């Protein structure tokens, strides 16, 4: 990548795609990358959420933000996102796989449908999107793939077996891709948050305070993370200066797991 001028933003001239970008952590990441100078296509299965995102960001970032609604657990959905992003802004250098969400319940209370949905939302979305965006990165010998994993894979939170199976697969995808493409200018990392102060967290806290407290009890700092704290780590990993960081699962977790 070319050397930045003194006043240039670190991601100026770069193009990013953020999946799961309409809400919560994904929305925070969209805002962070825009603030760093990237042009961003946000994707989500929630069309109305994407419309609200555009309304929120249009005044400041009208020429730098695009949205595309798709089911990214299907190959065709990921291919459609790739076409839309490239047509709008050109070749993509940064992919943030943030699409996800799972059904959190005791393992034997899952149905075949909830198990499949949890794997589809978290793992298949990352697999398909990585597969369709990697060739462009390899052609330029430069790219950043950042997966949003889960600290629960490491600390074994209650009722997270299915969710951890999906996110653990994402962690494995991270190390496999990082090694495979390490000499081709593409870094692949995972940011693994603990519970984060999103709308989902608020719903859990209100609906099941006892379960929410169990999540809090494993965090030495005694609080959940903030969206901006996760987005900040993603913003660093997306930059050229993070060129020597690859294959890592980096926890943003208030100490809920260490080392």
UniProtKB/Swiss-Prot annotation:
Keyword Oxidoreductase in the entry? The reply is yes
Is Oxidoreductase a UniProt keyword of this protein?
A: yes
Q: Where is the active site?
A: 163
> What InterPro entries does the entry give?
NAD(P)-bd_dom_sf, Sc_DH/Rdtase_CS, SDR_fam
Enzyme class, first EC level, given as a word: oxidoreductase
Q: Which keywords has UniProt assigned to this entry? A: Aromatic hydrocarbons catabolism, NAD, Oxidoreductase
Could you provide one GO biological process annotation from this protein's UniProt record?
Answer: catabolic process
Q: What is its EC number?
A: 1.3.1.58
A Gene Ontology molecular function term of the record: 2,3-dihydroxy-2,3-dihydro-p-cumate dehydrogenase activity
Q: Which CDD domains match?
A: DHB_DH-like_SDR_c
Q: Which PROSITE patterns match?
A: ADH_SHORT
Q: What superkingdom heads the lineage? A: Bacteria
Q: Where is NAD(+) annotated to bind?
A: 18-42
UniProt catalytic activity: (2R,3S)-2,3-dihydroxy-2,3-dihydro-p-cumate + NAD(+) = 2,3-dihydroxy-p-cumate + NADH + H(+)
Q: In which pathway does it act?
A: Aromatic compound metabolism; p-cumate degradation; acetaldehyde and pyruvate from p-cumate: step 2/7
The family annotation for this protein states:
Belongs to the short-chain dehydrogenases/reductases (SDR) family.
Q: Which PANTHER family match?
A: OXIDOREDUCTASE, SHORT-CHAIN DEHYDROGENASE/REDUCTASE FAMILY (AFU_ORTHOLOGUE AFUA_5G02870), SHORT-CHAIN DEHYDROGENASE_REDUCTASE FAMILY PROTEIN
Q: What name does this protein carry?
A: 2,3-dihydroxy-2,3-dihydro-p-cumate dehydrogenase
Name the species this protein comes from.
Pseudomonas putida (strain ATCC 700007 / DSM 6899 / JCM 31910 / BCRC 17059 / LMG 24140 / F1)
Q: What is the lineage of its organism?
A: Bacteria, Pseudomonadati, Pseudomonadota, Gammaproteobacteria, Pseudomonadales
